[in-house]
Design a protein with these regions (language model features):
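Structured binding/interaction patches within domain cores
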Residues: 1-163
């Protein structure tokens, strides 16, 4: 039986990043900075709203100008703004904004599903999820426009080449 399931643009690019080990060539903090730049230059122009302050909050957090409590406050404001949006494009852009204000996205390293035994006889295990930054970012930008995933891939490659 032939597999006819279509692979999403975000999944295609995730696979390329994994195969080419691109994310292993940069630090996590560089990855986050690249994501923020990409959002600012490629995604915000697609919106009818002024969104620059959101990225400024993320940068201020990275540069330790604001603390964890402030970034949570700004993320909550972004979620509230999302609830007032009606256009799907604006909602998808706001999803990216919320991700860029996410404390774990701004601070955590790439991680995946992990299963930990909470029972000494391994009878029962509990699955924990920690934000897996690269696939999540690709998924959200792919929801705006699948072409953005390829653009991000190229943007990353240029960054690494010029590093």
């Amino acid at each position: 039986m032939k597999n006819t399931e279509k692979i999403s643009p975000s999944e295609k690019i995730r696979q390329k990043l994994q195969e080419e080990k691109i994310l292993e060539k940069i630090s996590y903090s560089d990855f986050v900075k690249i994501c923020l730049e990409f959002v600012e230059y490629f995604i915000f122009p697609l919106s009818n709203r002024e969104l620059g302050s959101y990225i400024d909050y993320s940068k201020d957090f990275l540069w330790e100008k604001i603390d964890e409590n402030k970034i949570y406050k700004y993320q909550n404001e972004a979620f509230k703004d999302y609830l007032n949006l009606s256009e799907q494009l604006e909602k998808s852009i706001q999803d990216v904004v919320c991700l860029c204000l996410n404390y774990k996205f701004l601070t955590s390293y790439y991680s995946e599903w992990t299963v930990e035994s909470k029972n000494p006889i391994w009878f029962k295990s509990i699955t924990h999820y920690t934000l897996d930054s690269a696939p999540t970012f690709l998924h959200y930008i792919g929801d705006i426009d699948g072409k953005l995933c390829g653009d991000f891939y190229e943007y990353l490659k240029v960054y690494i080449k010029n590093k």
